[in-house]
From Swiss-Prot:
The lineage of its organism: Bacteria, Pseudomonadati, Pseudomonadota, Gammaproteobacteria, Pseudomonadales. Its EC number is 4.2.1.17, 5.1.2.3, 5.3.3.8, 1.1.1.35. Pathway: Lipid metabolism; fatty acid beta-oxidation. NAD(+) binds at M325, D344, V401, V402, E403, K408, S430, N454. The active site is at H451. Substrate binds at D297, N501, Y660. Residues 1-190 are annotated as: Enoyl-CoA hydratase/isomerase. This is Fatty acid oxidation complex subunit alpha. It comes from Ectopseudomonas oleovorans.
Amino acid sequence: MIYQGKAITVKALESGIVELKFDLKGESVNKFNRLTLNELRQAVDAIQADASVKGVIVSSGKDVFIVGADITEFVDNFKLPEAELVAGNLEANRIFNAFEDLEVPTVAAISGIALGGGLEMCLAADYRVMSTSAKIGLPEVKLGIYPGFGGTVRLPRLIGSDNAIEWIAAGKENRAEDALKVGAVDAVVAPELLMAGALDLVKRAISGELDYKAKRQPKLEKLKLNAIEQMMAFETAKGFVAGQAGPNYPAPVEAIKTIQKAANFGRDKALEVEAAGFAKLAKTSVAESLIGLFLNDQELKRKAKAHDEIAHDAKQAAVLGAGIMGGGIAYQSAVKGTPILMKDIREEAIQLGLNEASKLLGNRVEKGRLTPAKMAEALNAIRPTLSYGDFANVDIVVEAVVENPKVKQAVLAEVETQVKDDAILASNTSTISINLLAKALKRPENFVGMHFFNPVHMMPLVEVIRGEKSSEVAVATTVAYAKKMGKNPIVVNDCPGFLVNRVLFPYFGGFAKLVSAGVDFVRIDKVMEKFGWPMGPAYLMDVVGIDTGHHGRDVMAEGFPDRMKDERRSAVDALYEANRLGQKNGKGFYAYETDKRGKPKKVADASVLDVLKPIVFEQREVTDEDIINWMMIPLCLETVRCLEDGIVETAAEADMGLVYGIGFPPFRGGALRYIDSIGVAEFVALADQYADLGPLYHPTAKLREMAKNGQRFFN
């Protein structure tokens, strides 16, 4: 053994060839933490000191190569002064440079996934051989930063600036055939032939058949583009990427600027440019929020995994109520491998559900994400039925009938008599109390809520609602089924609206107050979209459905009359009474036409102003900042109340619920991180400025206490 550490070993293979293997003890994946970087330095030193070494193969002892840097270390690192961050990056890059500058040929054998620093390690090698099942990429822009271990320097010099910009700015994982096509890897082999392929390459380099020094040289030099080519490549890319990323996500454009600035430099000077830009991005609030989001997501996965121990495996599912929602649930279950019965009392609803599932599967086939054979397999896994004949072997039933408590109670009581005693019943409800629905059941311990968001196939969140009598096994089994469906489940306790809708309706309440104060809803939409929401509140209400919003608001007002009940008519009342229901009937706040692709397209409709006129009670002068505060303060304060009331267990889950469930701007991190970014004391003072708008704007006593003590939601 030439070197042995806790993350890296170097051992002799044959004929002077050594294997530098990453295998971080106590972890399921390899990552570049402080320990691994330090050991890489020692391992490279050991190789340099051993005159018998003729070639090096870099490999992994795990199913994946290296997933990148240890993101948990970013939180403290990024608090350092900018100059220290630059120095730290340059120090790390000296290790990669030392590996790249070894006097012997080097080959990276890429298995599983090599992301971020993992791919940057491979780029420092002379040759790369990749398993057919492996994926590689530089996803750092998703964290608000860009590659900092030489990725912006080596990749464009290997595969050309256009390809490198596409890889870095998109942050996507790339398959083996695509990597080979652009020259990011030198060979692609079957997984079982990976080591043999790496050995073949290194032996050919040692023998002189391959000139590894010539292969290495372009990575050490400036980019091979003249001034005109540079201008065309970089200016065009910056314009396009800025349009794609938007103003709230600076990292993709900054990555292009860095490649451009470093284009005329050799490796070492180019790495200095990279380090300086990386440090600037690392200090932004966007990076802080997106890294926080990543860590929150890991916390969500950890909590969901904790349920596995007692969860029953749902081998056979059923959905009650077909149609669009039932069809979407059936599709999601079947395509992820759990066969499902789809029951309705009407043949036309069954057909609608099957059509929905078939359409979604067909779309995946068209996009190359599913083979026709897999589509047929998924369709066969959906069994339509008008009766309960096959329900005896069902492990979990998702009830997705109309949002009416009496109807749901009747259907749930009926299906309970048709399933085995330990089958789980889950109601897909957005607002109705799980405790109320449970009263109709003989086995309420087997009952939970399972709130899917529309459209089911696109929305990543599922709220699993624990009722007073729900057993931990019922909760765990439902969480496990949601995970099998490819969803991100969050367990919440029962209350009107659960987490997401309870928080969303105060936001809509702020919107209603603005419209009643004479503020143009189109202006409100523009301001909130600029703030970072995927769509403004008026457009969102049209998409959700004015009738759905009207019903939801009434449920919330009944549940929280002290702050959510408004005695005055609102914009939603006016539109509902005028039968302007949004996209579903072609007119709401906006009117809707069908575009060339058959999708609804919003257009202005002056007639809505007459409908809204009776509910405009005053004409207030408000700034864009006021609009944001009228909307965001109620949403944030209701999130705080949900955490304080124990509806959601952690701040991480609360924030991820809003990002996944209603499209809260990811670069702002979630409602509680947004409060942190303002400062808890500053947020309380801000809310107090709007206290005259009503109880939705009044901070809780506990939040005032946090403000007084200088506390945060995230440390």
